[in-house]
């Protein structure tokens, strides 16, 4: 971790490009959706070629363990990227992190064209995974800081929608290129990501800096100007849900609350454990729903049920298309519906479908020689096309249910469930836990398919059911709950006067009087100055 910090601290400055800043929610959301599109491109870029003859001959038919490592290298890098985001959070601005990350993405994307062995492919995918892991926290944190509360859900839904569009576009590109019997086919596919990468790099200069981050660095005048511009633009389009223009004193409240603190050397305040466990449980629900396995290894499932050639390739594209189309629906209701209800309406049906798929595989599956030399595929139900059709239909149904429920809701649900003082740090922990679960399942999936066969789906279905049951019993409904209600529900820091950093009292100026109001404790009072840009001090 110390070595990683030393590298991060020496990052160069970004080139200055004069582009007019935008403060409109729709334009900011449009730019952020490019991040979702970029993240989506990486999902099928390797999976589509895993059963390709040219790919397997070039890389000498990877073993199930090697296949798992290749597929799992991206989420493994994602875990590292989450830690990098936490290290960079305090020192570097949100926009700088976006720009430095996308530059590295573009460089590594070009290097993909020069890959000649499994090790090189593994390293490139891991580095790109680090960028995606960084962005997975960064884009959610930035949206939470800049987008008004009533529009955050739809913003995340648009980002998720563009992620599914990226998956679909890349899948069809890979299908088209796989028809070309040459190693240049997968090389070109892995370089496509530089196009949206360059677009996002240029568009990032139009994004306003997070005024939360500016407050934490004492740049109060700049922070106030950005917050006022964002509020004015939003109020012009949404007068009923007007956002107040905050004073410097109100903005300074974020400093003592510590909402943006990602320093894990500092102890989390009392009451943080339960919401963190619930947030991590939601991430487990997303992973055990089987969506990454179905989307990542759909070509495996097609071959197991007996599909070949172009029929296999185009059938494997159906779940990506379903995922994209049905991801449009949450945008229409995510800001107005029960978080808990939508989560349950996704979790329970998916668990039943997974168990049904596993039961069909167990009953009708038969051992066979490795299909097309792929040592992960040693069983088949090719002699039962009717059963194979049902299995594929159930897989498509799982993808559809997931797209309408678990694709967006858990991210909003987790963010709303976390108390204000640990929202960013808690969300980072939950996302990191999600990447860890993604890596373990993606890495083990080829081995599980080889050894456990259909039982793999029964295990996923059973765990999804148990997690959904825990959501039903223990999870609160956060729709309509204020920050104070959330803190009260989890008994978060109910002892008056203790803040995130273990400080026992903070003195804040009272805007309604000449004096000040003091948050006191048994150990006395604490005055904490913020250095302002104009060399003045504000005591909070």
From Swiss-Prot:
Q: Which spans are transmembrane here? A: 30-50, 68-88, 102-122, 127-147, 159-179, 188-208, 276-296, 314-334, 342-362, 386-406, 429-449, 456-476
Q: What is this protein called?
A: Probable metabolite transport protein YFL040W
Annotated membrane topology is:
Multi-pass membrane protein
Instruction: List residues in topological domain: Extracellular.
Output: 51-67, 123-126, 180-187, 297-313, 363-385, 450-455
Intervals, Cytoplasmic compartment: 1-29, 89-101, 148-158, 209-275, 335-341, 407-428, 477-540
Q: What is its main location?
A: membrane
Pfam families to which the protein is assigned, alphabetical:
Sugar_tr
The answer to keyword Membrane applying to this record is yes
Polar residues bias locations: 509-524
Q: What CDD domains does the record point to?
A: MFS_HXT
Q: Which InterPro entries match?
A: MFS_dom (IPR020846), MFS_sugar_transport-like (IPR005828), MFS_Sugar_Transporters (IPR050360), MFS_trans_sf (IPR036259), Sugar_transporter_CS (IPR005829)
What the record says about family reads:
Belongs to the major facilitator superfamily. Sugar transporter (TC 2.A.1.1) family.
Write down the PANTHER family for this protein, in alphabetical order.
Answer: MAJOR FACILITATOR SUPERFAMILY (MFS) PROFILE DOMAIN-CONTAINING PROTEIN-RELATED, PLASTIDIC GLUCOSE TRANSPORTER 4
The ranges of region (Disordered) come to: 499-540
Q: Which GO terms describe its cellular component?
A: fungal-type vacuole; membrane; prospore membrane
List all annotated glycosylation positions: 52, 374
Q: Which GO terms describe its molecular function?
A: myo-inositol:proton symporter activity; transmembrane transporter activity
Q: Which UniProt keywords are listed?
A: Glycoprotein, Membrane, Repeat, Transmembrane, Transmembrane helix, Transport
Compartments where found:
Membrane
Whether S-adenosyl-L-methionine counts among this entry's keywords is no
The Gene Ontology biological process terms listed for this entry are:
myo-inositol import across plasma membrane; transmembrane transport
